[in-house]
UniProtKB/Swiss-Prot annotation:
Residues 93-101 are annotated as: Complementarity-determining-3. It comes from Mus musculus. Residues 1-23 are annotated as: Framework-1. This is Ig kappa chain V-III region PC 2880/PC 1229. Residues 61-92 are annotated as: Framework-3. The lineage of its organism: Eukaryota, Metazoa, Chordata, Craniata, Vertebrata.
Length: 111
């Protein structure tokens, strides 16, 4: 299975500043010229919401302050400017190989 290592495990960012979350895969998640890396946001009591798919594409209705980048094994999610509503857990997920696997999560809070 592809192992995803997320960092940091927790992060506190001031309103209006930038939050950066990293995800490293144990092997490349690229195939057919596509990076099969996705990012999800989850709030307590709610299902995960897709923010970014294929490394850098925004999900439907996702604000422009969420952006993703990377290829191969190294990826990042950026949130800028940080808003109060962005407090949540964030997860990377690879969809290159079954079983699809998730990172351990990053808890994002307001500083």
């Amino acid at each position: 299975d592809i192992v995803l290592t997320q960092s940091p495990a927790s992060l506190a960012v001031s309103l209006g500043q930038r939050a950066t979350i990293s995800c490293r895969a144990s092997e490349s998640v690229d195939n057919y010229g596509i990076s099969f890396m996705n990012w999800f946001q989850q709030k307590p009591g709610q299902p995960p919401k897709l923010l970014i798919y294929a490394a850098s594409n925004q999900g439907s209705g996702v604000p422009a302050r969420f952006s993703g980048s990377g290829s191969g094994t190294d990826f990042s999610l950026n949130i800028h400017p940080m808003e109060e509503d962005d407090t949540a857990m964030y997860f990377c997920q690879q969809s290159k190989e079954v079983p699809w696997t998730f990172g351990g999560g990053t808890k994002l809070e307001i500083k």
